[in-house]
């Protein structure tokens, strides 16, 4: 807190109580070399990209091979964001979320991350292979990684009992 708080009573005097939401300053900035730095970028940028793609499909009247649904969650970080029922006929879901970089990982900030497995287990083999094929066919630089300490919304979709193929990119 940006206040002089030492006790529960001090916090309550400011109108703060247990159960209140905590919102962190995202610390957004653009570096001299043009990089965007901020907390929570994965969700914001993923959402913007998906909304931009939806607008492109609509404006250009692009006919897709199958129906595409966008599902945005606000409970991702607590593990049940993707638990909502999926529309009838949906056989595959992709989570667009994590693009981790760091020690022990192959991906860089300039690549699409294809996740083969996370803390919930492996992603659908056919979906992962399709993601790799599509990246290659479209000249998209990518890396395949495993995130043993992370989970995704599409993992929650499976745990909710939805029998679908699933994948994760970031």
What are these regions (language model features)?
Residues 1-170:
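N-terminal hydrophobic/helix-forming segments and targeting peptides
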């Amino acid at each position: 807190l940006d206040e002089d708080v030492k006790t529960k009573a001090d916090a309550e005097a400011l109108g703060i109580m247990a159960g209140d939401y905590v919102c962190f300053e995202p610390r957004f900035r653009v570096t001299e070399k043009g990089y965007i730095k901020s907390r929570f970028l994965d969700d914001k940028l993923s959402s913007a990209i998906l909304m931009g793609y939806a607008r492109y499909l609509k404006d250009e009247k692009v006919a897709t091979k199958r129906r595409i649904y966008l599902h945005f969650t606000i409970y991702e970080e607590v593990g049940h964001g993707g638990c909502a029922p999926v529309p009838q006929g949906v056989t595959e879901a992709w989570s667009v979320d994590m693009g981790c970089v760091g020690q022990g990982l192959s991906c860089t900030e300039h690549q699409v991350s294809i996740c083969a497995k996370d803390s919930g287990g492996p992603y659908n083999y056919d979906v992962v292979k399709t993601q790799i094929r599509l990246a290659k066919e479209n000249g998209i630089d990518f890396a395949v990684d495993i995130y043993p300490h992370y989970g995704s919304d599409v993992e929650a979709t499976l745990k909710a009992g939805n029998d679908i193929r699933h994948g994760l990119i970031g």
